[in-house]
Each structure stands twice: as structure tokens, then as C-alpha cells.
Design a protein with these regions (language model features):
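Alpha-helical transmembrane bundles and membrane-interface segments of multipass inner-membrane proteins
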Residues: 1-157
């Protein structure tokens, strides 16, 4: 029971934490083209930006926003069911931690797609390679990537 509470709390922490950051970015970082919309963090290793992603990862599907939103909602719903089923079983905390990270990120990005009609991305890596430097992420993206890895490792046990 304690583990279930911890994992549900993790989902909520990711969702509300990322939502708070996204709202702050929308409020305080100017839109691209309307002033300085990039701030350096950690000595320039990270860049804080404001980017509206109307598709999926790397803006894929941006011309089919409705389809992207429906797929996002459907996958999030399935993931929610799998997550709650996993909470009813003993053991395999690695799988549950991965699912919690995935679900927190999925809730946040799906919420954006449905509410704002775009996902707010705000972090880039301050590297010399322009291909990587121009990609903009958010906390939920990192949680989804790490969560998928942990869930896969947890399923391999």
C-alpha cells in the first residue's frame, strides 16, 4: 500500500511540477521573435526557451494535431489502466517506477495537447552541435524516456 501511494504521488508530482514550469515559461519567456526567448542555465549547459510543439516528438504530426491528440489520449488511457493494475501486484517496483514516470509525463503532455492545443517545451542542451541544440524538451519528455527504459528493464525481470 505504501509503495502504491509513493508511485501515485510521483505521477502527480511530475504532472503538477511540469505544469507549473510550463505556466512560468509561458508567462515569463517571450515568444520566439518577440525579444530574448532564450536564457542560459548551469553556465550555458542548458538553455531555457519557449517553444510550442503542435505535434509529437520533434514536431512530427504537427499538421494532424487532432489525430496526435486522440492517439495521445488513447495511449495515456491504456497506460493508466496498466499502471493501476501494476499497483495491485507485489514486487517489481522498477516496472511501477517506470510506469509512474511514463504516466506523469503522458498526463502532462496530453493535458497540454487537449487544453492549449500544443505542448510547451522549454529545455535545450547548450552544445555546439546545432542539430541537438535546436531540439527543445520539457520535464515530461525526460520522464517518458527514463520511464520507458525503467519499465522495459522491469519487464525483463
Amino acid at each position: 500500500m505504501v509503495a502504491a501511494i509513493i508511485f501515485v504521488t510521483l505521477v502527480l508530482f511530475i504532472f503538477f511540477g511540469d505544469l507549473y514550469i510550463k505556466n512560468q515559461v509561458e508567462k515569463y519567456i517571450p515568444a520566439k521573435g518577440s525579444g530574448k526567448n532564450e536564457r542560459e542555465l548551469l553556465g550555458g549547459r542548458l538553455l531555457l526557451r519557449r517553444h510550442h510543439n503542435r505535434g509529437m516528438m520533434l514536431n512530427a504530426g504537427e499538421k494532424k494535431q487532432s489525430a496526435v491528440a486522440v492517439v495521445s489520449l488513447a495511449l495515456t488511457a491504456v497506460l493508466t489502466v496498466v499502471f493501476f493494475i501494476s499497483l495491485g501486484h507485489w514486487g517489481n517496483n522498477l516496472l511501477r517506477a517506470g510506469l509512474a514516470l511514463l504516466l506523469g509525463g503522458a498526463f502532462s503532455n496530453t493535458y497540454d495537447r487537449l487544453k492549449r492545443k500544443y505542448v510547451v517545451d522549454y529545455l535545450s542542451f547548450g552544445v555546439k552541435w546545432k542539430g541537438l541544440r535546436k531540439i527543445v524538451f520539457n520535464l515530461s519528455d525526460f520522464c517518458i524516456i527514463i520511464g520507458a527504459l525503467l519499465a522495459a528493464l522491469g519487464m525483463a525481470d
